C-alpha cells in the first residue's frame, strides 16, 4: 500500500508541477499587460490589445493618437481583488479594448483601509476616480472613450460613480445594483445577473433597470433607450452560473463585449469571431486536480513527521456533533452583544473569527470540566508538523493566485493571520477532540459532518442577524474549501491518528484564508 501511495503522490506532483508551469507561461503570454500603482496607492494592471512579447519588460511606445483603443475600468467584488476579473480583462483585451483592473481599498494589495463611512454609496469613489483619471491621461488609450465594469460590490461602485461623472460612455453591472443618488443618469447601462444569484439581487437589478428605462418592467435581452444619446438600458440573465462563476463565464464575456461594441460603435462584421478563450483555465484545472491528490499526500507526510496517538474509541462521535452545535449556538449569543475579535480590523472576518474563537473557548472549558483537557505536551509536539502542513497547503493553492485571488499576504495581513490563527486554534482543537475518533472512514465521515454543521451555523448566523448577510455569497466557496481540507485531515489521520496536527494546520490555514480575503478596516 505504501508503494502505491508513493507512486500516486509522485504522479500527482508531476501533474501539479507541469500544469503550474504551463499556467505561469500562459499568464505571461496573451494580451500585453503591466502591473503598477496609480494615484492614491491603488494597485492596477493594464491590459492592452496587443500580444505580449516574451522576455520584454515594461510597455512599448504608445500608439499614435488616432489608433488608441477605448478603455474599460474593472472593479471587483467584496472579499476579492482584480485577479478574479483577470480572465474577463484578458478576453476584452484580446478583442480590442484596453482594460485597467484595480484593487479597491481594503482589498488585495491595496493598503488603504475601507473607511468608517462605507455605508455611503460613494465610499469607493476615490479609487474609481483614480482609475478613470489615469486612463484619461494615458497615452496608450483613447481617454475620451471610457466605460466601467463592476462585479457585485464593484457594480455598486461603478453605478454610483457613473452618477457623479458625466464623461463616461457606458456601465456594465454584473450581479450588483443599488439606488442611484448622484446628480447624473448613468450612461448606457447593461445589467447582468446569474441564474443562481440570490433572488433579492435579481429583483434589485430588474427594478433599477426598469426605473432607468422608464417602464414598469423590462424584458430579458431587450434594449431600451438610445445608445447614441447615452440612455440605453438592457437586462440579461446569464444561465448556468452563480454569483462567483459568472465572472469566468464565456457567455458573460460575450454579452459584455457585444454591449461595449454597441456603446463604442465597433463593427466586427468583417472580422473573425471574437476570441473569448482564457487559455489559463485548462492548466489551472489540471493543477487543482493534482493538488487535490497532493493534499492527502501532504497530510500523510505531516502525519508521518508527528508522533502517533492512540486511536480513540469510536463511540461518542455522533454526540460530538451535538456538543459542537451547542458551542456554536452559545457563541452566536455572544456575537449578538459584541464582536470580541474586532481588534483584527477585518470587515466580516472579525465576526467569523469571533464565532469560532468563542465557540472553541466554551468547548475547551467544557472539556476541562469533564476531565478531558487538551494534552499540552502533545500539542507542543504537533505545532511543527501542523505548521508544515499549513505551508504545504499554501503552496498547493498558489495557482489560485493566477486566476482567483492573490495568495501572498501583505505585511499587514500577515500580522492579522498570526493573530487569527491563535484565536482559531481552540475551536479546531475542540472540533477534532469531539469528532476525530474511530477508524479512518468513521473519522472522515464525522469530520465532513462537522464541517457541514459549521457551514450551516454560518448560514444560521446570517438568518439570526449576528453574521453579515454578505457571508451567504461566500458560503459555497467556503463549503468547498472546508471539504478540501478534510482530504488533508484524512491523510494525517491515516498516517498517525494525530488529530492535534490537523487542528494546528486547519487553524493556520483558515487564518491565512480570512486574512487574504477579508477587507482591512480602518483601526
Segments the model singles out, each with a brief description of its role:
Residues 1-8, 319:
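N-terminal membrane topogenic signal
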Residues 5-19:
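Hydrophobic membrane-insertion alpha-helices, especially the h-region
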Residues 18-32, 517-523:
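Hydrophobic alpha-helical transmembrane segments in integral membrane proteins
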Residues 26-276:
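Soluble extramembrane regions of membrane proteins in the secretory/endomembrane system
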Residues 224-239, 259-272, 297-300, 361-369, ...:
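Hydrophobic alpha-helical transmembrane segments
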Residues 247-254, 315-320, 377-387:
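Alpha-helical transmembrane segments of integral membrane proteins, especially early/N-terminal helices
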Residues 267-318:
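Cytosolic-side membrane-insertion boundary helix
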Residues 322-523:
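Alpha-helical transmembrane segments of integral membrane proteins
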Amino acid at each position: 500500500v505504501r508503494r502505491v501511495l508513493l507512486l500516486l503522490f509522485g504522479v500527482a506532483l508531476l501533474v501539479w508541477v507541469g500544469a503550474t508551469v504551463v499556467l505561469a507561461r500562459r499568464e505571461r503570454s496573451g494580451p500585453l499587460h503591466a502591473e503598477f500603482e496609480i494615484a492614491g496607492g491603488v494597485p492596477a494592471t493594464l491590459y492592452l490589445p496587443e500580444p505580449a512579447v516574451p522576455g520584454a519588460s515594461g510597455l512599448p511606445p504608445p500608439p499614435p493618437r488616432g489608433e488608441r483603443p477605448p478603455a474599460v475600468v474593472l472593479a471587483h467584488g467584496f472579499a476579492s481583488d482584480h485577479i478574479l476579473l483577470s480572465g474577463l480583462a484578458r478576453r476584452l483585451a484580446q478583442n480590442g479594448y484596453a482594460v485597467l483592473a484595480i484593487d479597491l481599498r481594503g482589498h488585495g494589495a491595496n493598503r488603504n483601509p475601507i473607511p468608517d463611512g462605507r455605508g455611503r454609496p460613494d465610499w469607493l469613489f476615490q479609487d474609481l476616480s483614480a482609475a478613470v483619471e489615469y486612463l484619461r491621461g494615458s497615452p496608450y488609450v483613447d481617454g475620451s472613450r471610457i466605460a466601467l465594469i463592476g462585479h457585485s460590490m464593484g457594480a455598486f461602485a461603478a453605478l454610483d460613480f457613473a452618477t457623479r461623472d458625466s464623461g463616461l460612455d457606458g456601465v456594465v453591472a454584473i450581479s450588483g445594483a443599488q439606488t442611484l443618488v448622484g446628480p447624473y443618469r448613468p450612461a448606457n447601462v447593461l445589467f447582468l445577473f446569474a441564474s443562481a444569484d440570490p433572488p433579492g439581487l435579481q429583483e434589485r437589478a430588474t427594478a433599477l433597470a426598469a426605473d432607468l428605462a422608464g417602464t414598469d418592467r423590462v424584458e430579458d435581452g431587450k434594449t431600451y433607450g438610445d445608445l447614441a444619446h447615452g440612455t440605453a438600458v438592457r437586462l440579461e440573465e446569464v444561465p448556468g452560473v452563480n454569483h462567483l462563476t459568472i465572472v469566468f463565464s464565456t457567455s458573460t464575456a460575450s454579452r459584455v463585449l457585444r454591449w461595449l461594441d454597441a456603446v463604442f460603435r465597433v463593427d466586427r462584421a468583417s472580422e473573425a469571431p471574437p476570441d473569448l478563450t482564457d487559455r489559463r483555465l485548462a492548466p489551472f484545472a489540471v493543477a487543482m486536480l493534482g493538488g487535490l491528490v497532493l493534499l492527502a499526500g501532504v497530510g500523510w507526510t505531516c502525519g508521518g513527521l508527528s508522533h502517533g496517538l492512540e486511536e480513540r474509541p469510536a463511540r461518542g462521535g455522533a454526540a460530538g456533533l451535538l456538543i459542537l452545535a451547542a458551542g456554536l449556538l452559545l457563541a452566536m449569543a455572544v456575537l449578538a452583544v459584541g464582536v470580541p475579535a474586532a481588534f483584527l480590523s477585518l470587515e466580516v472576518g472579525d465576526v467569523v473569527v469571533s464565532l469560532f474563537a468563542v465557540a472553541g473557548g466554551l468547548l475547551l472549558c467544557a472539556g476541562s470540566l469533564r476531565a478531558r483537557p487538551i494534552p499540552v505536551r502533545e500539542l507542543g509536539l504537533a505545532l511543527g508538523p501542523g505548521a508544515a502542513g499549513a505551508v504545504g497547503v499554501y503552496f498547493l493553492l498558489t495557482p489560485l493566485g493566477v486566476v482567483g485571488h492573490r495568495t501572498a499576504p501583505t505585511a499587514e495581513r500577515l500580522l492579522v493571520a498570526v493573530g487569527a490563527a491563535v484565536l482559531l486554534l481552540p475551536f479546531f482543537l475542540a472540533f477534532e477532540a469531539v469528532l476525530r475518533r474511530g477508524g479512518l472512514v468513521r473519522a472522515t465521515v464525522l469530520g465532513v459532518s462537522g464541517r457541514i454543521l459549521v457551514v450551516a451555523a454560518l448560514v444560521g448566523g446570517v438568518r439570526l442577524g449576528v453574521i453579515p448577510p454578505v457571508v451567504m455569497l461566500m458560503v459555497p466557496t467556503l463549503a468547498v474549501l472546508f471539504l478540501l481540507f478534510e482530504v488533508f485531515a484524512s491523510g494525517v489521520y491515516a498516517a498517525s491518528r494525530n488529530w492535534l496536527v490537523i487542528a494546528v494546520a486547519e487553524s493556520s490555514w483558515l487564518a491565512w484564508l480570512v486574512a487574504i480575503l477579508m477587507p482591512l478596516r480602518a483601526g
